[in-house]
Amino acid sequence: MSTGGVLDVAIVGGGPSGLATAIECQRAGLSYQVIEKGGLVDSIRRFPVNMIFFTTPELLEIGGMPLVCHREKPSRYEALVYYRKVAQRYDLHPRLFTRVAGVERNSDDFTLHLKSEREGIPDPGPVRARNVVLAIGYYENPNRLDVPGAELDKVSYRYVETHPYFGSKVAVIGGGNSAAEAALELFRAGVEVTLIHRGETLSSHLKYWVRPDIENRLARREITGWLGSVVEEIRMDSLTLRDSSGARHEVPNDFVLALLGYRPPYRFLESLGVRSEGADGRPVTDPETFATEVPGLYLAGGVVAGRRTHMVFIENGRFHGEAIVRHICATR
């Protein structure tokens, strides 16, 4: 944690990758501060309430602490409990509900300008650090619909739980795990579900236990499927689809869950001098050290993958901090 003065490392983001980086800083004797705009591991807090991870518990572990769960795979709740215990065990003292509003590059270090996310709480003073690690994830940057009606209150880019939708007609847009799992949960809670996906088939990355379930529900028409179709307009009580033949269909609808994935905060990265390249918009970093082209600036976690968010998970992002800290120590 911070000891005052200029930090060795400022870590922006209090998710698993950020916490793992902080632990590595601690082990290397580097002064550090974790700065998180929300609560601890806020991205996991935002997951659907009943979500089960795709992976086994040991692949979510950081700092050598075991994650104990009651089933083969951990739940969202178990992960939240685990990461709280990690923060306590290592005395990480993250600065929570504090947003990094801007980063200035000085001759020898960085100045981070902070803004409180808590109403009525004054903004803290700036933080200076020789190195900055952006472990910021992408959950604040959902891929949004660009059609008439997308601004209506009935449209959401995040699914939390089934209860508010009971007895309603809900359109779930997307073909990945988030969309498929939301559609299944809603169906089992008494919701009339329509699943819409522009692809002719669902994602090849579906969890192995989700694929047969969603495919069977679609085959039995228990969930109405519109594959190879796109939404053209959203209205208060319906939406218009265009199928692969070009035909248009009006579908009665109460709520829309557009679960279309996420993207990195490109504007923020560009403001710091971080370029992105390729069709997947991957930020330019050294693949071994995760250093950007800006001296002293590193990326960690999901933001490294660009738009290919399925390529970096907690399972591999948790090791980024080790490589980053090794490079910082080698170049001091």
Roles of regions detected by a PLM:
Residues 135-136, 173, 259-260, 300-303:
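Short, well-ordered coil/turn residues at beta-beta hairpins
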Residues 301-332:
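A conserved FAD-binding loop/helix module that cradles the flavin
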Residues 4-5, 14-92, 180-209, 278-279:
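Beta1-alpha1 glycine-rich phosphate/pyrophosphate-binding loop at the start
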Residues 91, 95-129, 188-280, 332:
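A Rossmann-like FAD-binding core segment of flavoenzymes
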